[in-house]
Each structure stands twice: as C-alpha cells, then as structure tokens.
Amino acid sequence: RLFDAMSRERGFTFYLNVEVGQHLSHADLLEHHHAVLYAVGAPTDRRLAVEGAELPGVATATEVVAWYNGHPDYAGLSVRLDHERVVIIGNGNVALDVARILTADPDDLARTDIADHALAALRESKVREVVIAARRGPVHSAFTLPELIGLTAAADVVLDADDHALVLQDLQNADDPLSRSKLEILAKLGDA
C-alpha cells in the first residue's frame, strides 16, 4: 500500500501520534531538521448555511474523507450510498477526491489504503452518478490539475452543456498556463 512503499524510501521516516507541544517542541524539531512543515489539513468543516444542511445523509466532504481514510472519529459516519445520484457542493480538490472515490471501482480501491469499513460500504454502493455543483465557473475552479486528471482518468466525466460553453469561452481568453491546462482537459469532456 502507499505508506508501506513510502516507508521503505531512503531518508523517509514516519512518526504517528506525536503532538508538537506535548511530546516535543518546535525548537526540538528545528534542532534536527533544516525545515519543518506542518501539513495538518483543514482544521474544521465549513458547513453551508442552507436549508437542509442538517438533514440525515448530508455530510461535509472533510467528514467523508475522514470516513474513507479510516479516522476513528468518523468510522461510524452514516454515508448514504443507497441512492443512484449524489451531489457534491464545491469544486475544490476535496470535492473532486470524494467524487473519484464514489465513482471508483472497489477492486481498484482495495489496492489502496482505504479503510476496510469504507471499502465494504463502497462495494455495496448503488451510486452511479455524482454531480459536482459549484458557485464558480471553470476558470475560477479551486481544484488542481493532478486532482482533475485523477478524476477524469478514473471516471466517465461529462459537463453540463452550459459549462462546456463556458470552458470553450474561457479557453480562448486563458493566459495562465495552469488555467489553460485545466480548461483544455475540461474542453475534451463530453456534454451531459
């Protein structure tokens, strides 16, 4: 699995359950390393203030990611996979990653570090369509190129006809190479 391969890399050490401030200090880290990077992820969810956000079956993408990554606080999360269509609000990396997991072949996921309880639920999933809805258009989307490539390589992704027209329009005006690359991938997708 991913962490098994990484742990065999020369010069790589992975420590779990270490709390900076309790087990060691920031100064201790700097004493032994040239740089210290804190990669802790988003500290909290950002729930939308919309009607129905508190209903059963509604979860934040951060909660779903914690669920399929095996975080013990989210192992019992009720992730509703008993319907054919799921909607994800937002178009950042986490949204695309959740869409990729929900549409992935469970046999492919079995070769990853996905949590066993999530894999079992995904094997029984009735989800056949994932809709990503966002307030920003394609050129202002928050996802990165690798996340887009990961999703489009793993799933049959199509765009709403209006979004497809926006992509083509934005592509004509794109001067940023990264935005242009994202738009070129989106332009090749079929219409919904």
Region roles according to the model:
Residues Q22-L24, T44-R47, W67, V94-L96, ...:
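Flexible loop/turn segments at secondary-structure boundaries
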Residues N17, H23, D82-R85, V127:
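Phosphate-coordination loops involved in phosphoryl transfer and adenosine-cofactor binding
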